[in-house]
Amino acid sequence: MATDSLGTLTVDLIANTGGFERGMDAAERRIASTTRAFQRQEQAAERLVGRIDPVAGAINRLVQEQTELERHFRSGIIPAGEFERLNRILNDQLDAVQRGNREMASGAMSARQYQAALRGVPAQFTDIAVSLASGQQPLTVLLQQGGQLKDMFGGVVPAARALGGYIAGLVNPITGLAASVGVLGISFIDAEREAAAFNKAIFAGNNAAGVSGSGLSQIAEQASAVAGSLSSANKAAIALASSGKVAASQLQSLTEATIAIAQFTGKEVDDVAKSLSAMGDSATDAAAKISEQYGLLTYEQYQVIKSIDEQGNSQRALDVLGEELNRNAQERLKQYRESLSDIERDWIDIKTAITNSYAAVRSEIFPNQNQQIEQIQRILRTRQEGGVLGAVSSAFGFGENSTESLQQQLDSLVKQRDAAAKQAEEQAKITKSNQDRVDASREWEKENEKYLSSRVKMEKEISAARELGRKAGLNEIEIEDRIAQIRKSYEEKPSSRSGSLDAGQRMLDSLRQQYASMQAQLEATEKLGTQAQALVKWEQQLADLKSRGSLSADQKALLANADLITAQLKRNAALEDELNTRKEIQKTLDDYKRLNESLRTDAEKQLDLTRQRFEILDKARQAGISDDDYRRTAERIVSSSTTKAPTFSGVDAVVAGPQGELDKLDKAQEDLEAWYEQQLEILNENREKRAELNASWDEQELKLKQEHEDAMAAIEQSRQQITLSANEQFFGNLSGLAKTFFGEQSGLYKAAFVAEKSFAIAKTLINVPKTASDAYSAMAGIPVIGPALGIAAAAAAVTAQLAQVAAVKNVNLSGMAHDGIDAVPETGTWLLQKGERVTTAETSAKLDKTLDDVRSNQSGGGAPTINLIEDRSRAGQVNTRRQDDQYIIDVVVADLFGDGRTSKAIGSSFGMRRSGT
């Protein structure tokens, strides 16, 4: 019983105190919210100080880190030794910032001047490299470029300091990072300048865009993901926002469109942004001007924008204009980039990454497509004319620089240029056709104004007056008074039409005309205005008419046709919904198409390219090209239907050691096999579609097979070189150990020396065929005498390689004497000192046996201990140490007991195999 009473009391207490606890919780939340608000304000103030005074901001950050470090030290998380080390680092950084601030303040240059000078350093180094490569004297280059660098930094000493830091940053990124502390203030100044630019743009445009400075920065970042240049995106967003004529819903699309237009027109981003923001007060006028100036809107798109604008939804019309303009601009930019040569496209990417720092060098070092064609034609013409220059040029005509390869490159470039010219011509025709239709439509609309009825003119004025009154903040009574005045002015004018229809019939005809217009737009699957709003307004107007006591003739006519008008408005609203649905479906399909395009593999793109080329060739055949031209072009299409094999960068065992290079070879072999299988699939698919070119496909398949075999042979040769090099290194290290601990006359040292010598000979012999081939190719291209010189060069190269082998063979153990001598000769290197003798083999054997007997009777404590350790990451390391009067040698190998690559290579080279124990 007592328990039940206690439970009831507990429930009552909880129920009665619930409201009190909720009140306390609310108060605690308000206090916490207020505390967080003060904290945010305090943090914002600290960030503001950091932006205004970058050095103060840096010092504040370091002080905060030091405070946090002390807090962790007091709590016992960080030990004393670690605390002292980290605290010392923070103190050094604090001193560096303060010292850099003092030096910058007292120096001859400002931070801005210093930063500007540093930006010019890469260009100066590029000029130096180009001048030296073109053959100028080093002294001349030093006087020219050195003087410019001196002037940039205000003297020889400041220039030497700046360039020393710049070169150190190139050579050693760690020291470059340490030097960056001295220019910490410059980075903060740049960030503050960028943030201030966004804020100024917002206020300069009276915040018509409706976004904050950070929001505008985010829009620029999103646009840069599409355009690839954050600098251009920032400029475009700032220019559009500062104009005060672009809404937030348009900023994203117009920023992306501005960057694209600037790229393919060559205009400045600021100029394009200003022109887009000042196109006109209405979406219709802006669309017409954009179509006229840039040709980026089709006739159908213009009609849709005009229709939306005419129905009073001006902002929606502007949004649609921005979306269509951006979509068409991105497509035009894509066509423009595809028309460029590979070098031009690569240069644009590089120039975007370094903010156009090397624009002046482009025309000299990176030629455009026409300059590439002219250069290749000049090389081929020089080789055909012969002479000394022709012979020299032909001497270097191997690989991708061969005459055949250059001719293929020339044909490909000419074809790309002609195709781009044809595409540009077709695009110009399409653009002109769209512009003509837009101009004709505008002229038609102007002429149509002459024939509008008084009723239509009155309705337009009423609609404009109603919208103007709402924007001005007037009440409905004032707006209705103005509308009544407009109606009265038209009633006083006699109608020029005889037998005019009543108001109800005229409204019904107007709605039917709108329905017919929407049906036409439906065929183009474009979205129109909001007819549902018109239906709601009509229902309100109809209810108002029914509630009135007295009606005018027009109002009575509207009531008489109320059912028909309502039915027509419902049909218009239903059609509008269908148009909106189709628009969304079309947008989804477009997104799906772009998704599939982004997911296509290189093989699929290559197949489509080959198919398109054959389609063009078939059309050309129908146009009347000869069979020989058709066959030659078809063979070239077949030869270019596959891609080149992946290249292997070569052997470099400096970083990862021989094992790392073997892993790279395995990866290269896997890539090569995948490429070969993919190219065979592409070839077979093309063969099925073009069976009449079976002979050409067979020839292309043989080329693929040969290219695959050559690449596999190169990889295998590299694998043999790495294996032999690793074995040579291993036995070389072993011989060094034997020499150190057992002497040069020991059996272990002699065996290791012979093994190292064998691997060196084998590695040299592997390079003999390649050396001969390279020597022959270098000379065979010279006219008339080339083949003969090539044979001679190959023979000389082989002789040199074999001489190297002979030299390796002639290397013997220093000071070795086989028959015994009585005295040390005056010349030569011998392992004897004066007073010592070299005995005969028989005497030496007796001495060795005696020494062995002596050692067998001694303890083994003095003999060295060799530990073999398997660790692939430290393979090749040898460590020696002395412990308890005994030498201990640790030899680290990659594979101790397993059947690894090294074991296989040794077994293959010497015919050895493992046996069970």
Curated annotation (Swiss-Prot):
The keyword ATP-binding does not apply. Belongs to the Lambdavirus tape measure protein family. This is Tape measure protein. Its main location: virion. Residues 501-528, 575-602 form a coiled coil. InterPro entries: GpH_LAMBDA (IPR043680), Phage_tape_measure_N (IPR009628). Residues 852-877 are annotated as: Disordered. Disulfide bonds: none annotated. Pfam families: TMP_2, TMP_4. It comes from Pseudomonas phage PAJU2. Interacts with the tail initiator complex presumably through its C-terminus domain. Interacts with the tail assembly proteins. Serves as a ruler that controls the length of tail by stopping the tail tube polymerization and is probably released from the tail shaft during infection to facilitate DNA translocation into the host cell. Assembles into a multimeric linear form probably arranged as a coil of alpha-helices and stabilized by the covering tail assembly proteins. Its C-terminus fixes the tail tip complex, thereby forming the tail assembly initiator complex. Tail tube proteins polymerize around the tape measure protein, displacing the tail assembly proteins. Keywords: Coiled coil, Viral genome ejection through host cell envelope, Viral long flexible tail ejection system, Viral penetration into host cytoplasm, Viral release from host cell, Viral tail assembly, Viral tail protein, Virion, Virus entry into host cell. One of its GO terms (biological process) is viral tail assembly. It is found in: Virion. GO terms for cellular component: virus tail. The keyword Nuclease does not apply.
